[in-house]
UniProtKB/Swiss-Prot annotation:
One of its GO terms (molecular function) is RNA binding. Belongs to the SmpB family. It comes from Petrotoga mobilis (strain DSM 10674 / SJ95). This is SsrA-binding protein. The lineage of its organism: Bacteria, Thermotogati, Thermotogota, Thermotogae, Petrotogales. Signal peptide: none annotated. The keyword Ubl conjugation does not apply. It is found in: Cytoplasm. Required for rescue of stalled ribosomes mediated by trans-translation. Binds to transfer-messenger RNA (tmRNA), required for stable association of tmRNA with ribosomes. tmRNA and SmpB together mimic tRNA shape, replacing the anticodon stem-loop with SmpB. tmRNA is encoded by the ssrA gene; the 2 termini fold to resemble tRNA(Ala) and it encodes a 'tag peptide', a short internal open reading frame. During trans-translation Ala-aminoacylated tmRNA acts like a tRNA, entering the A-site of stalled ribosomes, displacing the stalled mRNA.
Amino acid sequence: MTTLARNKKATHDYEIIETFEAGISLLGTEVKSSKAGKINFKDSFCKIEKGELILYNVHISPYSGASIFNHDPERPRKLLLHKKEIRRLQSKVQQEGLTMIPLEIYTNNKGLIKVKIALAKGLKKYDKREKIAEKEYERRIRKQQKYENI
């Protein structure tokens, strides 16, 4: 499994509740660009429309080797999941007020490009501060234990 791109802000801005693996429908030039790692996740999200899961705001840079037959970098991309999983996701999003965000794009052992999506809950500003303070406290404890063991 090779990670092509990771959404670094996702764990900072959201509380991850559950993760899923989905296939993604890409054009040929998008596959080449994504395998080169030219993907940007900034402000990306997933939405269910007409029973299909769609990925928005993922920028895949145009492939330099393709002349005029390049893709639109910002186009919405269809994610491939079973209908049962899509219905389950839709019910959770509607009932619990969760959002779906992509966490990472990677290739599996067969060379297929997959997207790890998450059901997440947005964090408020005070939650983020609390999380940062908690991490800082844990870091201090680990540092202190390290020096005591020496």
